[in-house]
Amino acid sequence: MALFLIIAGLAAFYALALFEVKLVVWGLVALGFAAVWQMLVGAGFAPLGVGSLLYIPGVLMVILSVPFIRRLLITAPIYGAVKKILPKVSRTEQEALDAGTVGWDAELFSGQPKWNKLLDIHKPALSAEEQAFMDGPAEEVCAMIDDWDTRNNRADMPEHVWTYLKENKFLGMLISKDHGGLGFSAQAQSMIVSKVACRSIAAGISVMVPNSLGPGELLEKYGTPAQKEKYLERLANGLEVPCFALTGPHAGSDAAGMRDSGVVCYGEHEGKEVLGVKLNWDKRYITLGPVATLLGLAFNLYDPDNLLGKGTDVGITLGLIPTNHKGVEIGRRHYPARSAFMNGPNSGKDVFIPLDWIIGGTEYCGQGWRMLMECLSSGRAISLPAIGTVSIKQALRVTSAYARIRRQFSIPVGVMEGVAEPLSRIVKDAYMYEGSRAVTAAMVDEGQKPSVISALLKYRTTEAMRDRMNDALDIHGGRAVCDGPANYLFSAYQTVPVAITVEGANILTRTLITFAQGALRAHPFLYSEISAAQNENAKEGLKAFDKAFAGHTAFMLRNIAGSLFHNITLGAFASSPTQGPLKKHYQQLHRYAQSFALVGDWVVVVLGGDIKRKQMLSGRMADILSDLYLWSTTLKRWEDDGAIAEDLPVVEAIVQDRIAAIEASFQQVFANFP
């Protein structure tokens, strides 16, 4: 009987953990178990009896379920300790955390994904107008481009190509129709950039940049009515060519270390003395900089006389400056990896601009980093994933054809296992990353700003671009190594280092941003706990912390129980939204998401602020998160494509690869855990 009760008790408490039951219920169950034990087993083996001892935890749990008592005895000491050890979050870090939204990434962090959050994301589709643009102007400009002439002879696109792009509003796809732009969806922008880039990377980047983070998007979201009226239609029609200057020679794109500054003062503008900003800056690696007519500029704004009423250290601010303005210096052009797209430095010394040249006016002074992060959350989800994905797809198209017609030892090289292996990697990545690109663009179209997903997708697509271009060159051999007008691979291969580096270098994105930021933004309770600990009102902070901490404790117990159960049963009882061929793959995804939630929780709890320094560990957790995301979007793509039976072996191979990669990453985390 005693053994039976022990097993029943463990099962009951396991169920309580699995369903995140409140503490008072735990206490009542413990008291009930103690009473049953005493009735059926008796006082037992000790002077007080085991049954009597079992009442103690039950009573304690019931008492601690009263919020006031729990805060006094348990939460308050923990709250005080957390406040002391919690690293101070800088203003730029806080704004980066506050920017963007969470969606499917939060489901993966929860360990119990709600499948409707994934499957309800609409299928990738273009409107009739967008499809007509793809079939018309996008097709025509591809026919106009001679990539060899562009990158080898001119190191620029011909003037007639530039003119066509401008006149057909390729540079104004994200600008709304109300302001003269095309107002295309994120899906359309991604597909158009992909199409142009597969013909010429230089042309693709030249189209991508004005439709990503820059003056157009910033003015659409934050510009004053006068600024929108003045610039948006001109930007949409190509009468103004924009660039955005953030990166500098000293701090890179780290805004916290930026040395570029502006001081609020009075100065002369158009013959009148007006209140404005005197700027000094030095920027590098600015795409479209050499040909831009309108310069977006990030700088630290200071107001020593508090003329704006915002204090002396106003913060990061964004300005909009015509490049022909007095004092603006456009430096000698860069040649990133010998690519043909325009890129170069710019600088200015004691350049005076009026206050109405600040994007959004004085209302947005000091809010520049938040503005940039909000735009980057969506822009980064569209641009580089499009370039990376289409490069892999193009590599697949030409390499699969080449492997069929190139013969060695009287047989096509494609039938050789040594060639089939890298070719299969290209096949799998082309399918997988097209699915992730399409789903992520659809998220943006639904109004999400997926900051964590955009970061992980940027680094994974561009790393995959590097790997699969290497595979393609290996299969082609000398055919791809010798550059010339008929070499259809070398342009993309040449651009790989650029894609790896821009919009957040992959080393930084993988090891510092993806998991660390994801844990704070997508974890169900962590962000609430940190916000409570930073609350200047200690009473309110303690109350909020108590609520979040109680939820976090239940969440952790559920993860322990759920992970143990699903791993022992190999995911046989995990959830799945379908009974079809993908059922087992959804169940395994649930199983590994549960394990990720458990391990991720312990990593954050144990390391705390040290997670910034344990970058190898953080990078491996980022790999697991990104593998889970790519796995889920692959399953969704198969459903969205109409469940094509011939694609199922590819899907299953992708899933097996993701499982192997996740298990390897887990093993490395465990082997190197501090």
Regions found by a protein language model. Give the residues of each.
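Glycine-rich phosphate/cofactor-binding loops in nucleotide/flavin-utilizing enzymes
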Residues: G368, A480-L582, P674
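Loop-to-helix element that buttresses phosphate recognition and phosphoryl-transfer chemistry
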Residues: G418-D445, N470-L473, L628-R637
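A glycine-rich, basic-preceded beta-loop-alpha segment at the flavin cofactor/substrate interface
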Residues: P345-R380, R397-G414, N559-P581, Y592-K612
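Flexible, small-/acidic-enriched active-site or ligand-binding loops
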Residues: K326-F352
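C-terminal amphipathic alpha-helical interaction region
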Residues: A550-P674
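Charged, glycine-rich active-site and insertion segments that engage polyanionic ligands
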Residues: Q448-A480, P649-I659
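A short core secondary-structure module
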Residues: K272-V328
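Amphipathic, small/basic residue-rich leader segments at the start of a protein or domain
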Residues: G9-Y14, G27-V29, F33, W37, ...
